[in-house]
Amino acid sequence: MPSVDDSIQFVRGIGPKKAKLLEKLHIRTLRDALETYPRDYEDRTHITPIAEIDMEDKYAVRAVVGTEPKVNRIRKGLTLVKCTIYDETGTLNVTYFNNPYAAAQLRVGQEYVFYGKVQGYGRGRTMFSPQSEKVAPDADHPGRIVPVYPLTAGLTQRDLERVTAAALDTLTGEWPDPLPELLRAKYRLPDAVDALSAIHRPKTKDDMAQARRRMVFEELFLLCCGLQQLKERRKADSGIVFTSNGLDSFFEALPFTPTGAQRRAIMEIAADCASGRPMNRLVQGDVGSGKTVVAAGLCALAAQNGWQAAFMAPTEILAAQHAETLAPMLDKLGISCTLLTGSMTAAQKRAALAAIETGAAQVVVGTHALIQQGVQFHRLGAVIADEQHRFGVAQRAALSAKGGSPHVLVMSATPIPRTLALIMYGDLDVSVLDEIPPGRSPVETYAVGENMRKRITAFIDKQVGLGGQAYVVCPLIEDSENAETKLKSAEQHAKDLQKLLPHRRVAVLHGRMKNAEKDQIMRDFAAQKYDILVATTVIEVGVDVPNANLMVVEDADRFGLSQLHQLRGRVGRGTRQSYCVFFGADKGQVARERLRILCKTGDGFEVARADLAQRGPGDFFGQRQHGLPALHVADLAADLALMQNAREEAEALLAADPTLAGYPILLDRVQRMFAEQNDEAFN
């Protein structure tokens, strides 16, 4: 009797060669095959008579092969197989590209169900490269819902179906269900065996929907259990205790009145740091909400209690900017601020490292250089990571390891609806900065088409003439070779703008430049040595240039809404009225509607909600902390209610049984899900 832990290479029709290819999809055993869910489904249950095909679309057709399939070698690298098929209502051409085996698989006079895209009209109607299944003589309705699996070069859907069919044959009572029976009953979820069968071999759309609902709940429940265990495990560690006696002097030293949200976040941090457990908190806020002030509050707390704080930024130029912002705030309190970056001279590094090791450097700001082996902290008590999606769990852990169990504060400028944040960052507590400090005027935002090109170029010239500076952002570095989607690159835009505005100073910045070169260009732009900076999205998280008051984004339909909102946040940081112009309003109704959202609101949380709803979570949460388990089934936009249920149930279960000792199957699945974490909480 085959077992779910058997190797897939012994499945008939697979063998060692295809087994190697399947490994690329992380499929080594039959169990892996069962846990590799279809990425899509093709509904072939609706059979369309040939005569009723009236538009270019995918169809399932039950028809007989009418002419002998002929192999035509058009040229090297291109083979066509052509035949005609017919049913009671009409005939249809069939063409396969580069699949000479199709000629051997189809027999004249044999009936098949063909599924594929039909193009053309009248006698020219053709179904291209369809899937086909032979109709058994006694079959009255052979159409079915067919799973579509992820593939890699050298594998076909039939290979995945073979492996999955063999895996499904092992599904018996031996398949353990990680979901407690009470939960399955409460949410009316099918058991694991029925759900897996319906995921891979759905009989109806309802079967498929119920199975998916079960798998989504399971995935989110396992994730929430693991994150909750991780959080509780960290809380069990003894942490450094900071008293908050000096907070009043910190607030008094600020050159402005903090917002209510800033004050609330700092008080939440102070409470965490006084609890005797290591803090692990995320502060998220919109562009310009004042996260650096919150970080300064933690730095002050650490220093006032005799400990050091380390502040990591994703780029050297941002690290320098943070140091410049923090130094005057902390200097009033007698707290020193030291910068450490990779590009410093050897003498500068030696001086900084000595100050860090002796404790003379109370607050240290830097990049990944802070986690290198040569950096020895005297008494590291707090770690701050800016733009956490650019610093993974591993880097945070490496810095934390330098100080035992320091307090950790993570800052993100990507606003996320709070319900989602509590789940996606379930290993962290969450503070939200939902107020913008007074004095920042809204950025006037416009969505335009190519017909406005000359006017926008003139507007750039006008704003520079009035003393401002402009960003122009492009999605590509070099020109696209695809004529249909040809997008002008950053380099070409810079050349064109320089020709149109020869009296203006134009610079170009993109991701392929060396860090030192990028930093120098940004410093020169900030020092007003350039009027216009043409760039790719490397400026999305960039230096603060208060004098820049115009952002122009080319091909804005190529960016996500949240990314466009981040880009808009590069301007509006000074006293000048600022503007943002998105090109792409003439790219169709969908593009127009998306850009209209940005024109209507400057609220990053509102933009994030729209982004999730429109793009789905895949791209949006590509920014999730690296190192935590990926979601394979759940859709964060569509499954919000199930997500909330899963979180509540995980918290309730772990409150009653923190180690999951009474749920060994669930514990095993959680450990497997978090295996790559290699965290002691799961050993």
Locations of regions flagged by a protein language model:
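Upstream accessory/linker segments immediately N-terminal to the RecA-like ATPase cores of bacterial MutS
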Residues: K18, V71-A253, Q623, A656
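Short, surface-exposed secondary-structure boundary micro-motifs
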Residues: V64, K117-V118, G226, A556, ...
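Inter-lobe coupling/hinge segments of SF2-like helicase ATPases
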Residues: K235-S238, R264-M267, P278-R596, A656-D657, ...
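C-terminal accessory region of SF2 helicases/translocases
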Residues: T575, K587-N683
